[in-house]
């Protein structure tokens, strides 16, 4: 049957013919058979181009002739210029049935290849194949076996992974004719799909990771809970530093837009006011300047205490020690008889801010003073003392220092109440700092 169809087969033991001879034979074919010519002029060429050329690693039984759906018209062959023959062998004529089989292969026997690239295939030779194999640039060894498994077990089949929008770049290994001539065996172009990273995905992942890092930092910075934890940690560190070295407190919290001058150079007053305002405002620059009260050393009554505190501020402004617009805080202690024969020591605090027109007064808690110590201070003051209208010449602290052991004139409150004068001034200063903050415009807070 193969002889009737005009197909010559090569036995398995027969070595493949020399490709040089094949090329020479193809070039020497001067007359073109009618069947081959009509097959190329048939409109079924497009269907043939969509299938790769068939090749067999082992002899296969020939396909039964398939009759075309319509008779092929007779087309006279065109005039072909005469070429000197290189060899004397000529291919046998091809029958119309065989030409039709080669010109219109059945679709059901040859599924389309998914691994071969979608390119136009070269035209087949004018004559029928004269061997059991052929070489194609896009041939896939896993295809073309009429639906059966490949005959070469050493060649595994590869299928390209399916991905949306991602096509791996196939690497096509071309077989050279030199290796074929040396008898290495049947070679063909085998498509090995190689999965490569899409640069779009890599770039997107890099941007996402970078964006994720920055987004995490921004989210942490704007998280109220994290901010609260950081503030508490900062406060704990500052507290530890100031506990180990109390002298570091003015340097840690010094700064900001709030600048305050205390009208005294005594540390008991300056430190108390500094701690209070830095506690309320966070950062504040607080310094002390000695100011004159121009009243008696021991003021008596609320009016005298308020007068002494205000006079300290005015004296610094008159002498040019502080600017006319400078915010100042003044502290003045006085004694007052709140009840019959009941005397108390009280501190008066004044805050004056000319820029914002703020003027505030407050008082510390009252510390009881025994009557005998007040009477001693009154007896030590001359009757013709020019400042007797405002108070006494001798302070209560001086009398207590002389009368009691281990009592300081500047901080005798600890001995009588267990609370230092600095703590009393701090409590009142913190209250007046809160009132001052409430009256400031929002932009300056």
From Swiss-Prot:
This protein's GO CC annotations: cytoplasm; Golgi apparatus
Subunit structure: Interacts with PRKAR1A; resulting in PKA activation.
Residues covered by region (Disordered): 1-71, 105-167
Protein name (record): Protein PRRC1
Any one GO molecular-function label of the UniProt entry: identical protein binding
Cellular location(s): Golgi apparatus; Cytoplasm
Listed GO biological process terms: epithelial structure maintenance
Keyword Phosphoprotein among record annotations: yes
Top-level taxon: Eukaryota
Tissue specificity annotation: Ubiquitously expressed with higher expression in kidney, liver and placenta. Detected in embryonic kidney cells (HEK293 cells) (at protein level).
Biased composition (Pro residues): 59-71
InterPro entries: ITPase-like_fam (IPR029001), NTPase/PRRC1 (IPR026533), PRRC1 (IPR026534)
Residue ranges, compositional bias (Polar residues): 27-49
Modified residues (Phosphoserine): 209, 408
Keywords of this entry: Cytoplasm, Golgi apparatus, Phosphoprotein
Family the entry assigns: Belongs to the PRRC1 family.
Keyword Phosphoprotein included in the entry's annotation: yes
Primary role: May act as a regulator of the protein kinase A (PKA) activity during embryonic development.
Coiled coil (residue ranges): none
